[in-house]
């Protein structure tokens, strides 16, 4: 559970839940957190397209993903993985809307949270076609961040309309400390991943928040979070 100082909430969930039942999870979230900060859940146990990075596949604009043995890779065009990610996100949104409606919370002044990987973590964990991390290519890094921001903005606005509620965005950045500290592994020992410049990272985060609009949170469960960068 995350605790915030902003007056719109005093508690929320991180986002990821066990199990595969979207409606049951949504009912629990709305029942327990409707008076705090309810959120759309992620159910990674459902498999491909349901985890944090897979969720991004449903949000990216004009960018597709596919699976590889190590995780996800950028793809030339949308395929089964992207379609599955979109379908799972639609299911989660439907489940939250049904629970929200059943609880009588439409236009009730409550706030809802959505989660998405942040631009640094997304680029650090998704591969290019050559197998290297997308973060190693400055152009790919910028394009991914822009696509993510546009997609999350549309996702936020769409859910706000469906629930008739304010929606805030949580960017998950578990890979941010490693990306800044040069701790990301390369394809081989001879191709290390250089640390990303702090100004570049801050600029991408700021751009995402600006594009998304409204309130935004950053969540990182990894040690070594650079607080000075985020202030």
Walk through the language-model features, giving the residues of each:
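An active-site-proximal structural segment forming one wall of the substrate-binding cleft
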Residues: 82-105, 140-167
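Active-site loop segments of alpha/beta catalytic cores
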Residues: 147, 151-231
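A solvent-exposed, charged loop/short amphipathic helix patch at secondary-structure junctions
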Residues: 127-141, 184-195
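Alpha/beta catalytic barrel-like cores
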Residues: 1-117, 121-136, 214, 229
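Residue-level signal for functionally critical sites in structured catalytic/ligand-binding pockets
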Residues: 19, 39-52, 92, 110, ...
